[in-house]
Amino acid sequence: MRVRRQCSPVLHRSLSMNQISQRQGVAALTLGAIGVVYGDIGTSPLYTMKEIFSPATGIPLDATHLIGAVSVIFWGLMMIVTLKYVVLILRASNRGEGGIMALTALAAHAAGKTPGRRTALLLTGVLGAALFYGDSVITPAISVLSAVEGLEVVAPGLKPYVLPVSLAVLVGLFMVQRHGTGVVGKLFGPVIVLWFAVLAFTGVVQILQQPAILAALNPLRAVAFLHAQGWHLFVAVGAIVLAFTGVEALYADMGHFGKRPIQLAWMGLVLPALALNYMGQGALLMRDPSALENPFYRLFPQAWLIPAVILATCATVIASQAVISGAYSMTKQAVQLGLLPRMQVQYTSAREAGQIYMPEVNWILLAAVLLAVVGFGSSSALAAAYGIAVTMTMLITTVLTFFVVRHGWGYPLPVALAATGVFLALDTVLVIACSLKFWQGGWFPLVLGVVLFILMATWKRGRELLIENIRNNDPELLPFISSLAKDSMHRTPRTAVYAVANPDTVPQALLHNLKHNQVIHERNLILTVVFHEVPWIPFEERVQVTPLVPGFWKVQVNYGFKNTPDVPQALELCRDQGLALNLFETSYFLSRETIVPTKGAGMTHWREALFAAMSRNAGSVVGFLRLPNNSVIELGTRVQI
């Protein structure tokens, strides 16, 4: 007898509602990804074609070269963005997170079996992170400038106002950062969707008038164009690479939106819109070479120019906002990985922990962006500075991905080389091409990157020397507290939490407390906050409690580099491990070290002096760990390194 199983109407309806809810969630994330992830690469059509055929490249403006250049752009988008990032690199998630920091941690964990290789991978990742800041300066400058330059097309007499208007837009953008982007952020997706729709529509209009441009879909036209350039190839590629800037955002924002929404957004809207617009600009230039003065804005009829300038300015502001937010996020991760000193972090949303504002980063970025705008003066001049930092970051991403594929995923060496070798060759060509523009402005983002790299490397090495000094000079913890347990010293009926970097030596704050106050608390916690090379640490793994001697416990609080530290909240979890605390009867003792540079130690004297200056200006550990101000006692000590 055959039994036929049927779903109840209620269960069927429940499953349908869940499917609808999931689809709505994916749709919302896809819309968000379009607004945040693709703003940078989506505004590249504003200046790319203009720079490819500028006098600096020497590429003739004729049908053959136009079709060839557009073909290189199209197949570059297919190879670099679609195959490398959308297909391969989005698979390399670090517990769902992406970005150069997450990839570095993943590669170092997978392949860093020896200290030398691990250090090399970490330094490579740190360089990639440092170069990101160069991009964070150039992107707002070139994007806003290129959008506002549309005023020149509207009326040539408005040219003197381009620079002041650009500066005003940028200052306004950075000024509103402290208020957060929660409300305005809801408009990002719809505005950028409209932007891509306009890109596609204006491109189609021109293609219909000059369908010969569709020959650019043939990859042989790209090969022929590159082959015809000879050694001039690198100059041409140095301009074409502008079409790919912003591609790193696909991977960096994976943790915010997820892999699938980013892939859907690219394949469903962004790639078609970009391809159609570049072909449309090529078609326009084939019909009217004089449009080279500004091929993007010449796509529009005269009556549409002012709305086009307004929409382009909105799109570039959104693209800049995404880069600025990325700089905040990157800095916070660098601080928690021990690469930069503590900085003030303000949370601008009660609902979204990822929406933060960092005043120091904001004002330094603003100063650098304004310097770039005033110093270079136009989007064409800035285009020379753009690219070198981006392509070096792309190359570093490919190198790190190789180690993840080979050692993290366990593929044989030939497979790992096959998966990344072509991209490694492409990225190398792009880096060489952009390096030719070093003296024309490429030095600017590189200098920024090198300065950040020196700061990061110095801070990391300085902290290592500091902890080594403490370990060598301070007494061991266990024998010391064992002797205290036998002492009849008066004990205060409260809890003392001693925050330390090295849990195996006696905290300086404890020594000061005993020396000056002649008192010890009933409950003493030797607290260590450890940031791991993973994005998130779940609550059940947040705290580890180890009893030492009566009245003393060692407590380790674990965070990922994207977690937000909150020590009082973490201490409440000690109850689950048999250590019940009353946080209202708890005092936090901190040691603040004053660094004294000493010749002949672990770093050159100038780096020690730099580390000492960074240490003096580091943000308060009280705010960083979210300690209650009225329960903190801070004691100072001088440390030679």
From Swiss-Prot:
Primary localization: membrane
One Pfam family per UniProt: K_trans_C
GO cellular component, as recorded: plasma membrane
Membrane topology recorded in Swiss-Prot or TrEMBL: Multi-pass membrane protein
Molecular function per GO: potassium ion transmembrane transporter activity; symporter activity
Reactions this protein catalyses: K(+)(in) + H(+)(in) = K(+)(out) + H(+)(out)
InterPro entries: K+_transporter, K_trans_C, K_trans_N, Kup
Family: Belongs to the HAK/KUP transporter (TC 2.A.72) family.
Biological role: Transport of potassium into the cell. Likely operates as a K(+):H(+) symporter.
Entry protein name: Probable potassium transport system protein Kup 1
Annotated organism of origin: Polaromonas sp. (strain JS666 / ATCC BAA-500)
